[in-house]
From Swiss-Prot:
Catalyzes the conversion of oxaloacetate (OAA) to phosphoenolpyruvate (PEP), the rate-limiting step in the metabolic pathway that produces glucose from lactate and other precursors derived from the citric acid cycle. Monomer. Binds 1 Mn(2+) ion per subunit. It comes from the Bacteria. This is Phosphoenolpyruvate carboxykinase [GTP]. It holds the Pfam family PEPCK_GTP. It comes from Parafrankia sp. (strain EAN1pec). The lineage of its organism: Bacteria, Bacillati, Actinomycetota, Actinomycetes, Frankiales.
Length: 607
């Protein structure tokens, strides 16, 4: 076995951070790489690694006139998405992981990982990737170091985080960092030929909350391998936030400016496929209103000296789902992708560009699909994988707000929760207080089956849109949200809204056009925040009063508007009856306040 001292590169460490150096030495001795590289995040490093990946067959450079400095990658067909069944929260006690997470005894998991990681980087380079989540120098930001044997991960981390020398400088000689180890699990024996996308059929995405560690094995795919994203920014950060009195949330952040120049910053949590990125890059249809982007996926929020919640976007890039992103659905996302992008599992055009379903109304006559096969419009399978991705600097988005990198963060005025609901849930409902808002967040759901008329389809709960991402017991997470409200000045807390863009008629027709028209709902929210709209009380919460939602130029019938802006008490009685089954999942750890909210809702519906 090679000792760490014999591995080239360890002695070239550009840091005196004792804990970091000891950890890198320990992982090097375990994984046995051929060499160690300390990543500086420079352009020359990026150019060298992309050239290496092109030579390996992992990347294909796209036409430089059509997509400057952009690349295409196709993954192994077995490695295309987050692997929730292989994702573990290894807290000291099983009950601290809770019923919504996979748990394994941490000692048992460490034994498994020790065996898997032993020698797993043989024949490969071990890259040490220091990174900052959030703007450099911000008190809301936090640091991490990822060790990986994937140059694809290194170039992606350069886009998604503030990576390299600036992060290492901020770490200093004794700063806190989250250690994150990643391996493809594909050691190369001497003389063996590498494959374009190395991975392993055995996969573990493991988090140790108490020690703030992340270990990921077997996958090269984004969410499993870019450990700053969901693993750190949500799963580990949610535990840090619980312990330190802040919030790490699966939320977009947008800046809304009224025609009068009044600004509000709004955070919003939606499960996947519910329009989060589209709302983050909203183009308002309402004249005079302006929407700008602060973040499209994750928000870290801490209290400022003035008692308000301030948010930063911890990411530096966008890691978006390509299919369905097009000129009609999200033109700002398309404009963002002009260059400096890596596309994974999309299709390639004959002229050196990329394409995916939804990018353009017309399909190209011929493509190379994500599996490398010829594709025509007559092909039976999609040209791009449904979870095909793009990685691109957020700074290229034409709607980025100037405040998006403000180290102080932005003050949040309102928080929206929403799912994909064909029935029951109105277009917008304001919670009269923080506790009701937490109740709304705790019952967020999407319908997975169509409903019969006057009934509710099968629901998939995704509380706070955090179901796959909460790093501890979700009942304790609800309690943490309630505690955040208890210790704050109620007048300075963001107001909470429950929204639903996806209501349908009994015939299955969408009642609300969504997309840019959602600016009308945001305008009503702003008018509530400014004390202008009075709203109307309902058993659920406060809805727009007749005439308050701006409808000029809106192609929605009066009857549909009435459905969208009312609470059907009979349907909501059915809805309320479904909540205990969800709450009982959490046993006696569920906060009593949420049961009280449920009981009060039932009384109001029957009153």
């Amino acid at each position: 076995m090679t000792t760490a001292a014999q591995i080239p590169g360890l002695d070239a460490a550009p840091t005196k951070h004792a804990r970091l150096l000891a950890w890198v030495r320990e992982i090097a001795e375990l994984t046995q790489p051929d060499r160690i590289e300390w990543c500086d995040g420079s352009e020359s490093e990026f150019d060298r690694l992309t050239s290496l990946l092109i030579d390996k067959g992992t990347l294909v450079q796209l036409d430089d006139e059509k997509r400057p400095n952009s690349f295409y990658a196709a993954s192994d067909p077995s490695d295309v998405a987050r692997v929730e069944d292989r994702t573990y929260i290894c807290s000291e006690k099983a009950e601290d992981a809770g019923p919504t997470n996979n748990w394994l005894d941490p000692a048992e998991m460490r034994t498994k990982l020790g065996k898997l990681f032993s020698g797993c980087m043989r024949g490969r380079t071990m890259y040490v990737v220091p990174f900052c989540m959030g703007p450099l120098g911000s008190h809301i930001s936090a640091l991490g170091v990822e060790i990986t044997d994937s140059p694809y991960v290194v170039i992606s981390m350069r886009t998604m985080t503030r990576m390299g020398t600036p992060a290492l400088d901020q770490l200093g000689d004794d700063g806190f960092f989250v250690p994150a180890v990643h391996s493809l699990g594909a050691p190369l024996e001497p003389g063996a030929t590498d494959v374009p996308w190395p991975c392993n059929s055995t996969k573990y995405i493991t988090h140790f909350p108490e020690t703030r560690e992340i270990w990921s094995y077997g996958s090269g795919y984004g969410g499993n391998a870019l450990l700053g994203k969901k693993c750190y920014a949500l799963r580990i950060a949610s535990v840090m936030a619980r312990d330190q009195g802040w919030l790490a949330e699966h939320m977009l952040i947008l800046k809304l400016t009224s025609p009068a120049g009044k600004v509000h910053f709004i955070a919003a949590a939606f499960p996947s496929a519910c329009g989060k990125t589209n709302l983050a890059m909203l183009i308002p249809t309402l004249p005079g209103w302006k929407a700008e982007t602060v973040g499209d996926d994750i928000a870290w929020m801490r209290f400022g000296d003035d008692g308000r919640l301030y948010a930063v976007n911890p990411e530096a890039g966008l890691f978006g789902v390509a299919p369905g992103t097009g000129e009609e659905t999200n033109p700002n996302a398309v404009k963002t992708l002009w260059g400096n992008a890596v596309f994974t599992n999309v299709a390639r055009t004959d002229d050196g560009d990329v394409w995916w379903e939804g990018l353009t109304p017309d399909k190209p006559a011929h493509l190379i699909d994500w599996k490398g096969r010829d594709w025509t419009p007559d092909s039976t399978e999609p040209a791009a994988h449904p979870n095909a991705r793009f990685t691109v600097p957020a700074s290229q988005c034409p709607t980025m707000a100037p405040e998006w990198e403000n180290p102080a963060g932005v003050p949040i005025s309102a928080i929206l929760f929403g799912g994909r609901r064909a029935t029951a849930v109105p277009l917008v409902t304001e919670a009269p207080d923080w506790q009701r808002g937490v109740f709304f967040g705790s019952i967020v759901s999407s319908e997975t089956t169509a409903a019969a008329a006057g009934a509710i389809g099968k629901l998939r709960r995704d509380p706070f849109a955090m179901l796959p991402f909460c790093g501890y017991n979700m009942a304790d997470y609800f309690a943490h949200w309630l505690e955040i409200g208890n210790k704050a000045d109620p007048d300075k807390l963001p107001r909470i809204y429950y929204v639903n863009w996806f209501r349908k008629s009994p015939e299955g027709r969408y009642l609300w056009p969504g997309f840019g028209e959602n600016s009308r709902v945001l305008a009503w929210v702003a008018s509530r925040l400014d004390g202008e709209a009075k709203g109307t009380e309902t058993p659920l919460g406060i809805l727009p009063a007749p005439g308050e939602l701006p409808t000029e130029g809106l192609d929605v019938s009066e009857a549909d508007l009435e459905t969208l802006l009312s609470v059907d008490t009979e349907v909501w009685r059915q809805e309320a009856e479904l909540i205990p089954e969800h709450y009982n999942t959490f046993g006696d750890r569920l906060p009593a306040q949420l049961w009280a909210e449920h009981e009060a809702l039932t009384k109001r519906l029957n009153g």
